């Protein structure tokens, strides 16, 4: 496995965070190059400026030979404590992305393991995510399983 380093990113690298977030959104949502993402990116900027310093979002980059090749994020939040999550602490794994040309080298797995470790260091054991069919194997290999009994309500789609 190549030498891939995962590092946490702060708002001091906001420009890079936003650049990667836009790349992820364009790829995952198949947005055309000419799609206007300015309002969405302003919302992401406000989110990062608030959530990263407050510790409710952990962002990381994967680097190979000093080049950033991937990213990931972890949104931390509370829910009502329950028997399956007595602390009520939760982590939502998101924005896991590796640039084409660097996929298949274990980078995604390293990003996921790093972020799981960040959650566990904070005693958060309820970690969940949404996945695409191409990401399912990665997440299953990290120990994630299908969530049953969940539903989603969306408006305006």
Can you describe what each PLM-predicted range is?
Residues 1-15, 157:
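Conserved N-terminal entry element of GNAT/NAT acetyltransferase domains
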Residues 25-47:
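Conserved GNAT-fold acetyl-CoA-binding loop/helix
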Residues 112, 119-131:
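Conserved GNAT acetyl-CoA-binding A-motif
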Residues 140-150:
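Conserved acetyl-CoA-binding loop of GNAT-fold acetyltransferases
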